[in-house]
Amino acid sequence: MSWRLIAVLLAAMAIANAAHAEAPANPYDPLKTFAPLTLPQPATPLRTGAGTPGPAYWQNRADYSIEARIDTAAHVLSADETITYTNNSPDNLDFLWIQLDQNLYRPDSRGYAMGGGRRIDPRSHTEGYVLDAVTVERAGKPVAAHYVVSDTRMRVDLPAAVKAGGGQVKLHVRYHFTIPGLFGGRMAWADYKNGAIYDLAQWYPRLAVYDDLRGWDTLPYLANEFYLEYGSFDYAVTVPADMIVAGSGRLTNPQEVLTPAQRARLAEARASDKTVLIRTPEEVAATPPPGAATKTWRFHMDSTRDVAFTASRGFVWDAARINLPDGKSALAQSVYPPESVGENAWSRSTKYIKDAVERFSKRWFPYPWPNAINVAGPATGMEYPGIVFDGITDKAKTLFFISAHEIGHSWFPMIVGSDERRDAWMDEGINTFIDVYESDDFANGLYGPKRDSEYAPGPEAPADQIAKLLEDPEAPPILSRADTVREKYRHPVTYFKAAFGLTLLREDILGPERFDAAFRKYIADWAYRHPKPSDFFRAMESAGGEDLSWFWRGWFLNNWKHDLAVAKVAYVDGDPAKGAEVTVENRDQLVLPATLRISYKTGAKKDVRLPVETWMQSGTKVVPIEGGPAIAEVTIDPDHRLPDKDRSNNTFVVR
């Protein structure tokens, strides 16, 4: 053999080896995708393997009585609060942990340090809560309590333990704080043409949750959201006599604070499917200054984890009846300044609230409270039981999307009481998911499909937008503590990815009939309770009838990518009449059920469904196709329902 021939052979071998080395190996590993899944929280007698509260499930309770006053000159809220805490746990409790969320506004707060001023504007710094007195009731008498404040938390040492299994203690707190003037901690006040609007939330010291998984859950308030106990509230707000107060729950003294005309119009609204004006723009302009006179507005709310309210002399007010299942009703209301009036603006707010509450109640779980109130004010885009805060300049679809989303939070987390601080997707993602269908349904799709900052903000199909997120190596998984998710990923991951995952689960994995039954059962089982992610996963598997370990692992616990390809189409014996074999490959770790579309040269089409079991043993599948006309092309996921990262290999054209 000549040296020249040897050189040629060696060069050919080198080229072949290089080509082999450059061919990317398929990263798909079915043993990894379909491995047994250990969920974050184990099944116990308290939380069952079926995703329901178990026979031993317990939950503590906090009932509140609060008398508050607002000094509108100094912008200070002062209050006297009594908390009755019931310990249903199996543990005697020697101390209580209280949440002091107003301390977020202190310049030395952990939340301000973490946000670097991004969330909390330095101009809104305050002293936080000023605690004038903290006492514990013992033998019917108040006893000064020893307490320690740490950032947004306070530990109160008790003179005697609260006994397990139903023991009670009463805590009295007298306090005041300066109301922050800029949004950042999810509340604010601001001046407008007809008077200041105060959106008051996190306005009273609140019990932390003591649960079966962590005992006291004492994550500090870093400007994300909340985890709260359920109970009943009686609260009163004293304000200048020219102000209107709208709050969570039922107004118990309308005869003391409303005019006869306002009471009559409210009665009319309770019987009307059309919006009724309770206070007109002209009446706002004609309201005289109150002088030194004040009014006290009293509210009551049951089965709630929180209350919030708004107050202003400049509110236009309207309302309409909400028709609930079983012949029940509630009242949709909106309060907004005259500058927000308009048929393309806040004059339609009550219609949006009414429609959303009616549809969510019919589809998922009946709305439980007497009122659903939308507020135009400075604390834009925030939700509380029975009341939500939105932007005074919102209009048209922007106002619709934000109104439907915020009132949708009545179900998640106000009814289904998840831990927003640890598992934000369980309220934001699930709520965004139910918003998708409200956007499709309202006024025959007037504003649908849902496309906003929370869900599919770009021009591409939602699946194609999600595919880009899955390729981002820095994107966190959905199951991340809320405080660790950077702002860049908050909406894309916590809202959009979680919601889109649930649409996949409903429309492509379980189907609407199985999904809806399982989802309704989850809501009913966990209403006014505290589910964790594992409870949701188990509930959907048990009632939905599928082992979804592969889906939870790939979509929620990881940020796995998805890539299907049509690699080859070959006729049997070269004859279309004898059939064809289509080779499909799964080229990445995330598996999803898919549709394979056969397009014939006659113009006919045929769809073949590939379940996830297709990929249980291998990343390559040869799909047999019955004999028929000549095939023009074969496409996997032709309708862009799946987040396929590379669509260039989704279609195979048959020459």
Across the structure, where does each feature detected by a protein language model lie?
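Hydrophobic alpha-helical and helix-loop surface patches within well-folded domains
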Residues: 2, 15, 27-41, 45-47, ...
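Early extracytoplasmic/domain-onset interaction patches
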Residues: 23-99
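A surface-exposed beta-strand-loop module
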Residues: 23-28, 76, 86, 92, ...
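Short, hydrophobic/aromatic-enriched beta-strand segments in well-ordered soluble domains
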Residues: 81-83, 87, 98-102, 167-181, ...
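Solvent-exposed beta-hairpin/edge-strand motifs
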Residues: 93-140, 242-243, 599, 604-609
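Glycine/proline-rich low-complexity spacer/linker segments in large multi-domain proteins
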Residues: 108-123, 176-229, 233, 254, ...
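Hydrophobic helix-coil surface modules that form long, contiguous segments used
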Residues: 205-215, 222-404, 433, 445
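Beta-strand-rich binding/interaction modules
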Residues: 246, 259, 562-565, 571-637
